[in-house]
C-alpha cells in the first residue's frame, strides 16, 4: 500500500489489524501503545539528564498532574445506531487542509532523545501527512527539516530574543523555507523552576545543544564576540573534559572553533530571554512577517480577547506541558473560556495530550486542533523516525476509532454535547 493509499484508508482498523497480525506472528509493537509504558521505555532509552529534561516539569509537577486530571474528569458520551462506516478526520487551518486535527508540537533539544533529532521527526511527519512545528531551540536548522518535509505542512515557533534583528532573520528564514505560520511562545520569557534539571545541574543550552537555529543564522553568527566573556568561574572535575569535547564537536559541525562556540553560547544566554515582551511587540510583529501569527501560552480569556483585537490569527491554549508554572490551571479547564473569548479566531490547545481520546475531548471543548508533544519524543527516543511514525499512527488510529464508537463521522461533529464532566 502506498503512502497516499494508507493515508486515505480508515486509520483505526488499519493500525489495529497491523498490530494484531504481526502479534499473531510473535512480534509485539516496539513502541508501547499504553502512554505510561511508552514514557517508561523512552526514559530507559535516554540519559538521566535527557529524561529529566524531557519528562519533567516545574516545581512539584502539580501542573502536569492537573493537565492529566482534567482529561480524566471529562467523559465521552457515545451515541449508537449511527452509520459510521466512513470517517473524516481532516481540518482546515489557515487555508490548508490537514489530514488530522493535530500537529507535532515544537520541542527543543531533540538531539538529547536521538542523534537524528528534528530531522527524524520531520521525515516521520511528512511520511504520515502530519504537520510539524519547527522549534526555535531545534537541534537541526529549519532549512534542513523543511527540505525533508517537501510539501508537508510546517510552521515555525518563535522565542522572541532581545535582539530584534535576529528575530527578523528567523522570520525571513521561516518564510523562505515554506513555513505556513508563526507560533510565538509567550510563556517562556523566563525559564521555569524545574527541580529535576536543577538537581542534576543540567541546562542543555550551556553545552551547545538546541542551538541550531542560532548557529545557522547569519545575523546571530555576525554578533558572536571574538572570545567568551570572562566570568571568573573555573569549573573543575572530570566532567568538564566531556563538556569541552562536546562544545568542540558541536562547534565543528557549524564551522566554529571551541573559543567561538563558547562565545556563541554566552551570546545566546545574553540575548535569549525577553522578560519585557508585551502587547506592543505583538503589534509590531504584524509588520515583520506576512505569515499567520498564533500566540502560544494563552490561558486567560482576556488575553484571547486582546489577541482578537490586535488581529492575531490564532491562539494556542498551553501551559508549556506543565514546565513553567507549578500549580496553575489545566489547559483543558480553561479552554472553553478562551474559545468563547476568541470568537471566530482558531484556538488550538496542548499540554497533557496522550491519546486519541484526549484529542477528541479537546475538540469537543472547542479546540480547532491540538499539538502533540512528549509522546512523539518518546517514540523518537526509542526508535528514531520509525518510532515517531508509530506514535503518529497510534494517535490517528485511536482518534478514528473513538470518533466512530461515539457515533460520529467527522471531527467537526465533536461538541460539548459529546461530553459529561465528573
Task: Give the ranges of each region predicted by the language model.
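Short beta->alpha linker loops
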Residues: 58-59, 136-140, 162, 299, ...
